[in-house]
Amino acid sequence: SELAICGYPIRDLDRLMSFYLAAKNAGRYLVIDIKQAYLLKLFSGSANFSKLYPSPKDEAIKIFIPRGSWGLLDKDMKVFSERQLYMDYAEWQREFLDYPNKVDYRDVSKNQKDFVFYCSDFNLQNLIDIKPNPGSSYVRSLTEPFDVEMELKEELIKNWFEHFGVISKERD
């Protein structure tokens, strides 16, 4: 009933498709990472693979625009120019700033019930701005840890989600 957060390997387009279909069937948008949007764009432009995956402009997909390195995303554009905003992103990312289905943390935060939000282990800081509501959920579709380093990483991720009240502090 609140924000649904999902995690899976960023280049695993089959898992992306699973979450895409689940979000669509639930009447929600799948919010994907800008890198995933780029991958979908490449497949959409391919003669052989264009029908395998949805276009990054698909009506059931939203593209999450993170803060750039200067953090101008939510700043007053009367003070900063549009050119400066675009320069805050890598060249390959800039085209997605003009997509009609782009969203940023403000959109996700305001309309949490409308989204299944992809959040990789490397972008957990986006949760600081989004502030998941109580009752939000997390589905982790990743390999179970099989060494100490992976166990430590999983513990770190659990701590983030516990902090935001997405998962319970009770542990096995």
Residue ranges of model-derived segments:
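Acidic/His-rich, metal-assisted hydrolase cores and their charged scaffolds
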Residues: 1-172
